[in-house]
Amino acid sequence: MAKTLVVIDAENVRRSTWPNLSKEELVARARAWARAEGAPILVVFDGPPPEDAPDLIGSGGRTADDVIAELEGPFWLVSSDRGLRERVRDRAEKIIGGGSFLRNALHAT
């Protein structure tokens, strides 16, 4: 896998399966996947992240979508949010749906 940053829209992705993943479970699975793939990740949360770590950021007074939309490319986006996907399509090398990411990537670890 390329070493391109993989940006994960946390609230969108954790709600892509039933039952919904907790913030902590999403972080644990995303980190396990990143280690296995050798890929850097950035998990972006609405509000504060569940812990203070360099691979997790909160949105402050904005939405996670706005934070992600302001990121410089290139990056991969993991989100099923159509509006966000449209906002970043010129900078995203690859866009992966949240459910697909959880089923295919995270369960493979």
Stretch-by-stretch model annotation:
Residues 3-8, 12-109:
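Nuclease catalytic cores that cleave nucleic-acid phosphodiester bonds
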